Amino acid sequence: MKICRKIILLVLTISVLFVFSCKTNEKKNSAAQANGDLSKYELVAEAATKQCPVMLDEITRLDSVQYKGKENALIYNYSIINVKKSDLPANATDLAAGMMRDTMLSKLKGQAALDMFRKDKVKLVYVFKDMEGKDLFVFDFKHTEY
């Protein structure tokens, strides 16, 4: 029962936290304009990472944001600070991952703030690690999905 409660809390937390993670679209400055469109995403990632680590709720921390130019991807790195992957049953993890992905995708679709990302075909990647640094979930969304 305790594990199910943690999973439900994790799903709800993820749903709330990613609303905050997508608020990183900033205006280009003159240096970014001189370097082209791709550097604006490097600036977005740097600006977001400077504010990290940020506790989004009692168990979720945004650790960093990266931009991978070759993949044209913004990667949001999170830690779930009181969950160990080894404590979660595999079937519960798979179920939670499916629910979280669906919830995240539906919330991404409703965000006008992501129009610039869609236009520039940026892939959004959300990486969640447990308290030991092991991958719990990785969600990636192509611009055509969100």
Regions found by a protein language model. Give the residues of each.
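Bacterial N-terminal signal peptides that target proteins for export
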Residues: 1-9
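C-terminal motif of bacterial Sec signal peptides marking the signal peptidase cleavage site
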Residues: 18-21
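Bacterial signal peptide processing site
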Residues: 23-26
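Post-signal peptide N-terminal segment of mature Sec-exported envelope proteins
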Residues: 31-51
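Short edge beta-strands and adjacent turn/loop segments
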Residues: 56-82
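Short, non-transmembrane amphipathic alpha-helical segments
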Residues: 86-114
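A short amphipathic beta-strand at an alpha->beta junction
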Residues: 104-136
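Short, low-complexity, Pro/Ser/Thr/Gly-rich segments in the mature regions of secreted, periplasmic
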Residues: 133-146
